């Protein structure tokens, strides 16, 4: 009986070992599956994190592009307003240039007229009134006279026609204005033609 008991025990033992091996194999298989699932989850998490980072980068780039576009539109609007303002201010420039000879001729007529002659007096008064009205009208649109007699010579506003020595004037001073200059809204339309003291 002892052999039989041993045999049974050996058979039982083999069965137990076999079952234990099956359980161990199943445990290893389950562990491998869990590891695989964990690896898949880690891979999925890494993939999702990469996608999130990529999306955040795209959003930031798009926000930057939107800000740049807004700034560009604002700059364009400001430049356009400045150009329109300049166009308004200086649209009359060519027209003003054409009117200057008329003003010059009216002034020459006033200077050349004999104010003492009775026949000429009413005509002279009419020319003076016409000149005043004309100058007032163009000054409303920003045209101003440059008459620098006695002032320091400034090449931005004056054109030196001659230079002469003069004990009565300081050096580099306008002694005489040959032709008045004009400016339109701060921009010189025609410089004053002057004689400068040496």
UniProtKB/Swiss-Prot annotation:
Entry keyword Cytoplasm: yes
An annotated GO BP: protein folding
UniProt-annotated location(s): Cytoplasm
A single GO molecular function term of this UniProt record: adenyl-nucleotide exchange factor activity
One Pfam family in the UniProt entry: GrpE
Keywords linked to the UniProt accession: Chaperone, Cytoplasm, Stress response
Gene3D superfamilies assigned: 3.90.20.20, Head domain of nucleotide exchange factor GrpE (2.30.22.10)
InterPro entries in alphabetical order: GrpE (IPR000740), GrpE_coiled_coil (IPR013805), GrpE_head (IPR009012)
Any one GO CC term of the record: cytosol
Function: Participates actively in the response to hyperosmotic and heat shock by preventing the aggregation of stress-denatured proteins, in association with DnaK and GrpE. It is the nucleotide exchange factor for DnaK and may function as a thermosensor. Unfolded proteins bind initially to DnaJ; upon interaction with the DnaJ-bound protein, DnaK hydrolyzes its bound ATP, resulting in the formation of a stable complex. GrpE releases ADP from DnaK; ATP binding to DnaK triggers the release of the substrate protein, thus completing the reaction cycle.
Subunit organization: Homodimer.
Similarity section: Belongs to the GrpE family.
Protein name, per record: Protein GrpE
Species this chain originates from: Vibrio harveyi
Lineage: Bacteria, Pseudomonadati, Pseudomonadota, Gammaproteobacteria, Vibrionales
